[in-house]
């Protein structure tokens, strides 16, 4: 399913790049095309040094008929839709590939076969049209697109998605990880439970995850294990316990109680770790990003926690919370302005490219 977002649907970014970023070039008119293919979404975005900064975001997401994401099937999907998604992005903003100043691509972290599709296409475009190739870390891109749209200069970051659960903050030229999942990510927990319990797909119903929908009917939460180890979280035991209770549930109310218990434990644990990071760093803002950041329930919990500590909380538009090409284009633009490019021959994908090893030259 293809989705196309433009400034009219994304809204106006609240951040001013001249204040958020320590790089020049904002007086020039520069366009960067970004390609995202780290998991189930093939996305293309175009970013500019001029307002509204994000010109377009086009996504085509692979939805397996059953089970989770198979890397090779996702890669086949990406290869099949790539050319049309790229053309849609260019046509929407009235540009040709020759108008683009650089091509950015997410080189990791992610699923190897899926990553390689995006990397191969980006290399081909850069080499054939003589454009600089810009490497982008997928996790950094989630943070930077959120900073642009929220305008938060120095937040504690809660990055939650299907493949990542990380609490981080910026210090000394890098995003430092305060806590993370020890096993599966928050989004993976929710999706796997819903799938194995037989209540998904679809995973999202009227803007809410199906687990959140299921939980609405509960009178009280089921008792489930809460695991926070220092600053890290663990969800595999929670998943096993929740599925065990689900199979024993004799009524719809008991099933709803399992959903509510799962949600409260999962969301509560990531909010607790974020709260500890906020108290430690004494920062004045919390920023939620990643696919699970689209959850209004998690948003409310984060906002309440931040408010208790006299901090503000914010997040990007839902269309930019999950995987998208716009965040790759924007972070690619920042890298390009900072002079970071890569030779085609050196542009290897990095499936386990950690957030905290990436130097951030624009802050």
Curated annotation (Swiss-Prot):
SUPFAM superfamilies: Actin-like ATPase domain. Its EC number is 2.3.1.234. It comes from the Archaea. One of its GO terms (biological process) is tRNA threonylcarbamoyladenosine modification. InterPro entries: ATPase_NBD (IPR043129), Gcp-like_dom (IPR000905), KAE1/TsaD (IPR017861), Kae1_archaea_euk (IPR034680), Peptidase_M22_CS (IPR017860). Gene3D superfamilies: 3.30.420.40. GO terms for molecular function: iron ion binding; N(6)-L-threonylcarbamoyladenine synthase activity. It is found in: Cytoplasm. The keyword Cytoplasm applies. Fe cation binds at residues 138, 142, 159, 323. Disulfide bonds: none annotated. Its main location: cytoplasm. This is tRNA N6-adenosine threonylcarbamoyltransferase.
